[in-house]
Amino acid sequence: MSTGTPSETAKAQASASANAPSFESIGIKNKDIVQKSGVSLSDQQKVLVGSVLDLFEGNPTLKHLSLWSKTATFQDNITIAEGYDKFAAQWYGLPALFDPIRIQSHTVTSAGNPIEFKLKNTYTVKGVKSEQTMESTVQIEVGADGKIAKVSDKWDNELPEGAFSQALRKLNAVTVPTLVKVPKTEEEDQKMKAEREKRTQ
């Protein structure tokens, strides 16, 4: 019979939700999550979507990647990056090759597992100033621990030839983890973030 005292499980859940990642604790920029009529994300799902939108906009940080399982996978039409070293290199490689990256629109179409949203993103290839807008369907699979297990980016259209596709293929090469600098410490991460933000001002 219940005595009115919270069970250990309830206490653990309350403690977990108190310590749950938030827009503020992760430093998420994309806080205004657009949901299709009838779709209702939980606060935790909104944090995951906002963090992934930040990554697609070229704003990776170690805190953003702390929301991912170490064994997670990132997949798009031309690459599969399995494990932390590979998917971290993908996200840190994006702003190294494209600047600026601007999200034109996004709409969450499913609050299930996977969470699904439509994304329209404009990439400008660094140095070449070649601009390309891509539309895709993004799925975020969440593991039992609440961390991201997989992100799939399925493009609606074929990859156009030219500077954009060359840059993307470079990003998706197997050599990326050895070429792209992924910060090891919070201090290093903050320094890289400050340099990125200085460029976009």
Describe every region a protein language model picked out.
Residues 2-58, 143-201:
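Terminal "cap-and-tail" regions of soluble proteins that handle hydrophobic small molecules
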Residues 62-115:
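A solvent-exposed, acidic/Ser-Thr-rich amphipathic alpha-helical stretch
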Residues 108-114, 141-149:
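A short, structured loop/turn motif at beta-sheet edges
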Residues 118-124:
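Generic short beta-strand segments
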Residues 130-138:
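Short, surface-exposed coil-to-beta transition loops
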